From Swiss-Prot:
GO MF annotation terms: transition metal ion binding
Name of the molecule in the record: Sentan
Localization of this protein: Cell projection, Cilium
Tissues with expression: Expressed exclusively in ciliated epithelial cells. Detected in ciliated epithelium of trachea and oviduct (at protein level).
Task performed by this protein: May be a component of the linker structure that bridges the ciliary membrane and peripheral singlet microtubules.
Amino acid sequence: MGGCMHSTWDHALHSRGEPRPSEAPASISAPSKMPKSVSISKQLASIKALKKGSDLEKAIATIALVFRNASDPDGKLGKATAKKLLQTQFKKFTEREETKPKYQDILSELDEHTENKLDFEDFVILLLSLAIMSDLLRNMWNENTMK
């Protein structure tokens, strides 16, 4: 993504052959995919380490499962697929945002250079960028402060 660059330190480590912090070991980053017919909630329930996990841990695991189910065998997500995921699974955060210049910039990046793919880190940054600017998040915070 345009404004999402790895740090110089990160680049130096990677150039020496060390994995980037966002890259999991091959055994973790490329697990066998569950059939698409298995719901995310069932996949999440099958992860033993999360049986007593916190809501935040389960939220991150859910994002990882959605990404993994939609990604290609190399663990990358095509920009068209990412855009479709946003439209189908993140629509409460993106609806009525179309007129915001920042939203338009983010989405136009998904339309450009479609041969480029997103790794998990870029996908999470994309989600967080859209969530942070969304009216839904602002409304949630306003409702919680009044209670």
